[in-house]
């Protein structure tokens, strides 16, 4: 999970493995969340993180922070780190090109969504062009109105199925 990436040693090992797999011709897709980073930013802003049933309650203000942290800071830093280490990474957000579409999971969680549709084409295009796609887990609402916070493990599994991944 994402919390494991807090460890510098583990993060460096994972990044090295991703680059090695890519260099030997294995298509690798990195799907990430960023719970600890979101919590840290909310704390800086004086906003308390609240969880129900293990899910972050995501009101509109929190969703703005989630989107900024996941699609901005975490995504771009991870892609940049892969590139610095010799990979060819490109950062994508689930909002890009209709990659992830979601519907409200349950009103008690706020803007937390469940995936309704995954379009693997943007990721497949990056893989075909020789890039390591780095995907953050914010989804466009099927209503076209809201963005939703999506569980990264669920998003990774659904994207893997949509891509026909072997592992």
Name these PLM-found stretches.
Residues 1-167:
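Nucleotide/pyrophosphate-binding catalytic subdomain
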């Amino acid at each position: 999970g994402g919390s494991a990436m807090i460890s510098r040693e583990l993060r460096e090992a994972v990044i090295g493995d991703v680059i090695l797999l890519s260099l030997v011709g294995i298509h690798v897709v990195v799907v990430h969340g960023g719970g600890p980073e979101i919590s840290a930013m909310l704390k800086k802003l004086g906003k308390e993180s609240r969880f129900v049933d293990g899910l972050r309650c995501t009101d509109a203000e929190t969703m703005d922070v989630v989107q900024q942290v996941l699609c901005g800071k975490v995504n771009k830093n991870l892609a940049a780190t892969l590139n610095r280490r010799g990979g060819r990474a490109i950062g994508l957000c689930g909002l890009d090109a209709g990659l992830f579409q979601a519907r409200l999971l349950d009103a008690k969680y706020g803007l937390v969504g469940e995936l309704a549709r995954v379009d693997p084409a943007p990721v497949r295009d990056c893989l075909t062009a020789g890039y390591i796609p780095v995907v953050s887990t914010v989804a466009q609402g099927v209503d076209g109105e809201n963005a939703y916070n999506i569980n990264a493990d669920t998003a990774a599994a659904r994207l893997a199925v949509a891509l026909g991944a072997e592992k």
